[in-house]
Amino acid sequence: MELARHSEEVGVDAIASIPPIYFRLPEYSIAAYWNAISAAAPNTDFVIYNIPQLAGTALTMSLFAEMMKNPKVVAVKNSSMPTQDIQMFKAAGMAAKGEFIVFNGPDEQFVAGRAIGADGGIGGTYGVMPELFLKLNE
């Protein structure tokens, strides 16, 4: 919460968070965690960071639907390996909010992610090889 408040104070555009790690928590606890972070920075947009292979918890459609009730949730960074997740989050987000952003995470899936609806990508090598990814984006 302290980092969320600080982030808002310094003027970030959005805050992203993975679910709590180590202990596997029920979905209502993950929603409460994300909503508490979002509430700590009430004037800042929130991005759900779905990276189940490292966080140990996948963003399910039921948890996603619960998070769509939070008006500050504007996007998902999807780093799960099934690219179909991008389509599901995009469609459900658009249905719930009218506008919704989905970022592709895995660098190796950038082209596939963009082809099936990701609005952009946030990845480890994008900043190291920006020309390549800009060209791929064309």
Task: Show which residues each predicted segment covers.
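Catalytic alpha/beta core domains of metabolic enzymes, predominantly
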Residues: 39-40, 44, 52-138
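Active-site beta->alpha loop and helix N-cap motifs at the rims of alpha/beta catalytic domains
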Residues: 1-58
